[in-house]
Amino acid sequence: MTIENEALTLKKRFRGYFPVVVDVETAGFNAQTDALLEICAVTLSMDENGDLHPASTIHFHIEPFEGANLEKEALEFNGIRDPFSPLRGAVSEQEALKEIYKLIRKEQKAADCSRAIMVAHNAAFDLSFVNAANERCKLKRVPFHPFATFDTATLSGLAYGQTVLAKACKAAGMEFDNREAHSALYDTQQTAELFCGIVNKWKALGGWPLVDEE
């Protein structure tokens, strides 16, 4: 691999971090007490031109953990009317996270990256719920950095002057279906496209690769 081609890799682009786009749907705002009900993760890949693209998608509906709080307003907001319905096909937090982390570790290794980093819209919220679930499940091998993230609310505010996901996507020239919004699957896919678009636009403007200083 030439020096020029080496610069056009995920490992080089994000300082060894492997970006993974995540969205969660929950039964409230408190990560310690409120249920995690849905999670989706989208991995990313970089092509030979150094452009970023969505790669693999993994998605789960999740059973409320024992004793979890369920805020009525939150359930109305995300459209999950009955978190205990067998029609949801929900699995435990532990099963969902283990499968997601298995995929992340596999693709992180293939990209020769040292650690995963979460990409999310208002990322502190999503990371707080994932970290709380990790603690409940006593998971030791967690691929994500415990606090560092790429927040697309901040990035889209810089790039497009919009911080709301729907408005940021539209400002970026993307379609956004409000009827599909607040589904972890749909929101993660849209966030992944938004993040890739911002990164690729910055590259097209000459912001990457950096010119090495001698």
UniProtKB/Swiss-Prot annotation:
GO molecular function list: 3'-5' exonuclease activity; magnesium ion binding; nucleic acid binding; RNA exonuclease activity, producing 5'-phosphomonoesters
EC number: 3.1.13.-
GO biological process: DNA replication proofreading; tRNA processing
Domain Exonuclease per the UniProt entry, residue ranges: 20-195
GO CC terms, sorted: cytosol
Site (Important for substrate binding and specificity): F29, F77, F125, F147
Domain of life: Bacteria
Cofactor note: Binds two Mg(2+) per subunit. The active form of the enzyme binds two Mg(2+) ions in its active site. The first Mg(2+) forms only one salt bridge with the protein.
Binding site for Mg(2+) 1: D23
InterPro entries: Exonuclease_RNaseT/DNA_pol3, RNase_T, RNaseH-like_sf, RNaseH_sf
Group of enzyme by EC: hydrolase
Positions that bind Mg(2+) 2: D23, E25, H182, D187
Subunit structure, as described in the record: Homodimer.
Family membership: Belongs to the RNase T family.
UniProt cross-references to HAMAP family, sorted A to Z: RNase_T
Protein name: Ribonuclease T
